[in-house]
Amino acid sequence: LKKDDKKANILIWTVSAVVFAAVVILHELKIEVDLGFDPHFFARLNAIINGSVATLLLLGLYLVKSKNFMAHKRVMNLSIILSVVFLVSYIAHHILADSTVFRGEGSIKTVYYFILITHILLAGLSLPFILFSAYRASIAEFGKHKKLVRFVYPVWLYVAVTGVVVYFMI
């Protein structure tokens, strides 16, 4: 990939804005269609994808610490691809299935909503930084990549893990 920060900035911010807008708009859209299966299947799929991404992120950290940079690159690219698949599945779930209401009471309800709200906010905020990190690595600006990753990696890992936690709490 050739370095072109101006085009990369425009592309990354545009993709991030479009994804955010799509999630917000499509979250409110409901389509009644008989799929032949329970559309809540997508929630389970999302948890599996989130768990897989969390595992890959941990593996990616191990690989980079082991200086296995080629394997690290492949694992991180797979994490991004799975995150795109997650996004499609997430939108499908919210378009096709009714919302599930958390039925817990007391302090567990507070814990659930804290996890859910931080998960949603950090998922939305982290996307452009994940993309900028991937861009910096792809143009071999590893110092800048490493600076970004120190912030975005723990956030991305938190989002992936809490996605699974929210699924099991419901």
Which sequence ranges carry the predicted segments?
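Alpha-helical membrane insertion/targeting regions
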Residues: 1-170
